[in-house]
């Protein structure tokens, strides 16, 4: 029933979404905890942790494929080491910027020296980076004052630490304006990682949402986040259908029939989402 060109456009878009390979940048100064956060979020150990500052000297592409889905993390070198390195990093970041679906920017919750990060963030905005593609995360939440009160049994901050984290979060939100809230995490013990995953899935562009979700560790998933990924998938297919139909001039009765067909196709594909991703 569907015109061949419309059918072909929908199939092409469906294929591109199902096989989309997301690219996420992980930024932050050396020692911010980038590798630990990656390992806490995703199914595979995608970044090698290292105790020494400055261990990431260049952008490392970490492409992994636990099943049929490919995804790439770009582990970006830390800022604020030396002026010479920062200049090199700026050129590198400008080159990589267009291909990144999202940039997760990691700042230590237990320090206040954010000047290098602020300067680099402003530079990227001046280079045309989309502000809505930045997600700011506070790492090492377990080390904020008073660090000795961290609850090792429950793996969560004490009441006093919660107040400290609220203060730091508010300050960082002011220094780094973003479309999304700043989240504190303690990656090694998994504290607040599911909340970060939820925020990340909402921050991703529509074509990347389902593909990224398929790489998330099981303990970080939730029914609500999965429904969002499914809904976003359906919306992208619907938009593809609408764009294809808009290329033609159809009579009113045909448009009404096409709308019904559109809804059936979306419902079917969303139902099959578990099998597609």
What does each of the following model-derived ranges do?
Residues 69, 98-103, 129-134, 176-181:
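Short glycine-/polar-rich loops that comprise or flank the Walker A/P-loop
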Residues 29, 75-77, 136-142:
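Short loop/turn segments at strand-loop or loop-helix junctions that form parts
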Residues 40, 99, 116-123, 164-171, ...:
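Alpha-helical scaffold elements adjacent to nucleotide-binding pockets in ATP/GTP-utilizing enzyme cores
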Residues 1-73, 272-276:
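Conserved G1/Walker A P-loop phosphate-binding module
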Residues 56-59, 76-103, 107-126:
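Switch II of P-loop NTPase G domains
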Residues 185-188, 197-204, 218-277:
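P-loop NTP-binding site
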Residues 142-211:
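Canonical P-loop GTPase G-domain recognition
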